[in-house]
Amino acid sequence: MKVDFLVIKVEKLSSLRVFYFFLFFFESKYVEDQKIKDAKLLQLDFDTIRLATNDFSPYNHLGEGGFGAVYKGVLDSGEEIAVKRLSMKSGQGDNEFVNEVSLVAKLQHRNLVRLLGFCFKGEERLLIYEFFKNTSLEKFIFDSDRRMILDWEKRYRIISGVARGLLYLHEDSHFKIIHRDMKASNVLLDDAMNPKIADFGMVKLFNTDQTSQTMFTSKVAGTYGYMAPEYAMSGQFSVKTDVFSFGVLVLEIIKGKKNNWSPEEQSSLFLLSYVWKCWREGEVLNIVDPSLIETRGLSDEIRKCIHIGLLCVQENPGSRPTMASIVRMLNANSFTLPRPLQPAFYSGVVDSSSRDNNHTRNPRIASLNDVTITELDPR
């Protein structure tokens, strides 16, 4: 392999430093070559995709994803596809694009969207995914009519599926991955309303020994309302960043309202603050979508999910459970959950007792949260 070597002065460098310099150079080049090699296996013809989307017609436009617009397409075989067209103003360069292709191509989980291929041509960058006619959870859960389709069984299946998908990304895949943009519009729904996590343009990889560590970035990317406070304000992120976003999503699914929603009589309270206020005052029924109460009542399963959601949105990342703990909580029939502390971005009256782990709980709250848990400490 022909390589243009850099001209450097090595007189003052130790032989060991020279060795590590060239080791890093060749290793980096190998990684990039391997990414491109993997990506070529999935490369599709641009004209094929252009025709499939009717030349990216506005009628085929499905919405906006991370870094670009998404279109519906139909291949000659009749297969329906979703095409993510990278915006030239998005800020996602070739490295990020190749990263998404090479990464997603290797991910195999029933709760992750499957990548079918990609395309490079000139300045065009396209990602081709499997298509879901139900589109995203956002189209259902925040629509007063379509939300009625989502009974509690479906909502619980969505919550559990997203939890398993994130656990796979954090701990079980070949790579260890932080999604960084977990939200309702990035959860697609198949014909049976099973959830599929989508949009991997903002993911970050980390080593196994970094799973409990915090990393930093000067380029904060994501969606406000779902961002953890430490990430939004300081660029600090970890697996607990995704956990926070998951908690927001869980509470949205249960209430059927966006995170920026506030009740008319309490316009200063957004969703997290409203849920916390109701929880503290023992008015848990007010947290739940009325359509669920009418058809199912306030079940232990619903109470458990509210409790888990509040544990996830705690201000301190160290207080939030891991996705492994969350999956265990969701699967357990008998579990005693730790008492959640005040959520991040709380806009109501601060109750100092909510920050005290030894404080005696309000008996009204305790009576609502008598789902028993044996594993108190998150892994």
Curated annotation (Swiss-Prot):
The active site is at D181 (proton acceptor). The modification Phosphotyrosine is found at Y129, Y231. It catalyses: L-seryl-[protein] + ATP = O-phospho-L-seryl-[protein] + ADP + H(+); L-threonyl-[protein] + ATP = O-phospho-L-threonyl-[protein] + ADP + H(+). The modification Phosphothreonine is found at T223. It holds the Pfam family PK_Tyr_Ser-Thr. Keywords: ATP-binding, Kinase, Nucleotide-binding, Phosphoprotein, Serine/threonine-protein kinase, Transferase. ATP binds at L62, G63, E64, G65, G66, F67, G68, A69, V70, K84. InterPro entries: Kinase-like_dom_sf, Prot_kinase_dom, Protein_kinase_ATP_BS, Ser-Thr/Tyr_kinase_cat_dom, Ser/Thr_kinase_AS. The modification Phosphoserine is found at S185. Its EC number is 2.7.11.1. Residues 56-336 form the Protein kinase domain. The keyword Nucleotide-binding applies. SMART domains: S_TKc (SM00220). This is Cysteine-rich receptor-like protein kinase 44. It comes from Arabidopsis thaliana. The gene is CRK44.
